[in-house]
Curated annotation (Swiss-Prot):
PTM comment: Glycosylated. Glycosylation plays an inhibitory role in the interaction with IgG1 and IgG2.
Protein name (record): Low affinity immunoglobulin gamma Fc region receptor III-A
Protein keywords: Cell membrane, Disulfide bond, Glycoprotein, IgG-binding protein, Immunity, Immunoglobulin domain, Membrane, Receptor, Repeat, Secreted, Signal, Transmembrane, Transmembrane helix
Annotated Ig-like C2-type domain residues: 24-105, 107-189
Spans within the Extracellular topological domain: 17-208
Organism: Macaca fascicularis
Transmembrane segments: 209-229
Gene: FCGR3A
Amino acid sequence: MWQLLLPTALLLLVSAGMRAEDLPKAVVFLEPQWYRVLEKDRVTLKCQGAYSPEDNSTRWFHNESLISSQTSSYFIAAARVNNSGEYRCQTSLSTLSDPVQLEVHIGWLLLQAPRWVFKEEESIHLRCHSWKNTLLHKVTYLQNGKGRKYFHQNSDFYIPKATLKDSGSYFCRGLIGSKNVSSETVNITITQDLAVSSISSFFPPGYQVSFCLVMVLLFAVDTGLYFSMKKSIPSSTRDWEDHKFKWSKDPQDK
């Protein structure tokens, strides 16, 4: 870990008695947010991390090889396939970031999304991206081979709240001029909350409402019994105190 620190920052750490593991981790952001792009696309990678007053340089790594750029943003003016891979960054007062993947594809169309795994009720943003942003019309987004959404002019497709039914294979197609073009297929996965999943496994959907009603009724009955018993206890105590017992003598006391 020490060899990854910038020389100036290393001296500062030693003098301050700090350790490398005490530093925050840098973070890489893609701008725009898509990690799958087409050739000729413009891509910007930004490094977020702390800097010392003496050293505001940034170290960039592509597939573990050091890049010459030392600014906080790394620009790719026209992406090529060999730009694909993992990118990391590090600042003078941060440790090496986690890797961010960039995929450069060749084709007319590419279906883009920030990621491919979502939780239930999360929003999904899909984009049917054309090469060099060529005009695209009569666009259809398809799920499992069936049309899901149609736009006369190219538009992004939003799913406000994802459900398990939104899992599946997706691609988009449209017309560039009179040419019919399609993107590659990608898989989107919707995961379920574990707590909800465990309840659902015990009770089928048709019985969950009935189960809740039964629980409410049981609670009401239990509460009624509690107050009824609480009210009767003092009365029973008074009856016990007022009752006179007549003891019989032993035979030898007669």
